[in-house]
Amino acid sequence: MKRLGQEAIDVYFVHGWDRHTPIVDTLATLTDLVKAGKIHNIAWSNVSGWQLQKIVSTAQAEGFVVPVAMQPQYKLLERGIEAEVLPCCLENNISLTPWSPLGGGWLTGKYSAANRPRGATRLGEDPNRGVEAYDIRNTDRTYRILDVVEAIATRHTRPMTHVALAWL
């Protein structure tokens, strides 16, 4: 932190659910860090709706700090959080900060059925890499969504990235 010229972290994200550590222990530690001025707010990434609600309920019941943000995978191509995570965030006034909102390049117009990833790029070197893998997303559903995004972008003379981010 000293090297960065910072005294505290604005928002500390816990990257997932730790099934080996009781949530009360994690929240107690994070609350201690907030009280010590090391971090200002806490948040979570990649947890389900029930896990997020357990975090919030435990924090409230025990007098610990409550998360201010949730960072799920969310974009036009992946809307799985809408059934549980999104309602939990709304109910508990938790901000949403999606990761990979452009789908690893998919929602930029970078990839298409005719334009496979090539060369020294993440997917060019390994088309099966990660959740945005070309071979996983290379589906009719993906191309139908991309066609609509592209049509909206063209109609408004904006890049596809603007449409995808505005949708959020």
Predicted stretch roles:
Residues K2-P22:
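Active-site groove signature of glycoside hydrolases
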Residues T21-L168:
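Beta/alpha (TIM)-barrel catalytic core signal, keyed to glycine-rich beta->alpha loops juxtaposed to Asp/Glu
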Residues M1-E7, G37, H156:
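A short, glycine-centered helix-capping/turn motif at helix boundaries
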